[in-house]
Amino acid sequence: MKVIIASQNPAKIAAVESAFNLAFPNDTFSFEGVSVKSGVPDQPMSCEETKQGAINRVNNAKIKLPNCDYYVGLEAGIEGNSTFAWMIIDNGLTVGESRSSSLPLPPQVIDEVKKGKELGDVMDEQFNTDNIKQKGGAIGLLTNNLLTRTSVYQQALILALIPFLHPTRF
């Protein structure tokens, strides 16, 4: 089965691959990351805006690569003093969705993001890292790598897969 991931971010791709392989151990998948627009600002600043970005990514991936088995959109955002991400999974018949855990952000990080900077760039500046958003993310930095962007996204993706695990109930 072909799974299209509406991102080329390695951390997001790894999370999707892991979630699908754990949820469906007897199935064989091929995964492809594609670059598509989210239709929202680079740094979404509300739950609604973030969810819409994930939905838009799925819809744009379906246009770019039609006739695949699953489309997955992941969009990270900020609301208040926390960051989180929305997961949308669509197979053309069913849509599964879930929001990740929320990660509190330090006040100085929030201040910079409110000035229009992307969270990943702010984290790189303040923690002297390089391209953290494609690695462990802010989650990895702030939890001392007890959790990573991939591990938290994997959990949310598994939750979004529930309607596909139990199709007769949804």
Swiss-Prot record:
Keywords: Hydrolase, Magnesium, Manganese, Metal-binding, Nucleotide metabolism, Nucleotide-binding. Its EC number is 3.6.1.73. GO terms for biological process: nucleotide metabolic process; thiamine metabolic process. Binds 1 divalent metal cation per subunit; can use either Mg(2+) or Mn(2+). Gene3D superfamilies: 3.90.950.10. The keyword Coiled coil does not apply. Belongs to the YjjX NTPase family. Phosphatase that hydrolyzes non-canonical purine nucleotides such as XTP and ITP to their respective diphosphate derivatives. Probably excludes non-canonical purines from DNA/RNA precursor pool, thus preventing their incorporation into DNA/RNA and avoiding chromosomal lesions. This is Inosine/xanthosine triphosphatase. It comes from Aliivibrio fischeri (strain MJ11) (Vibrio fischeri).
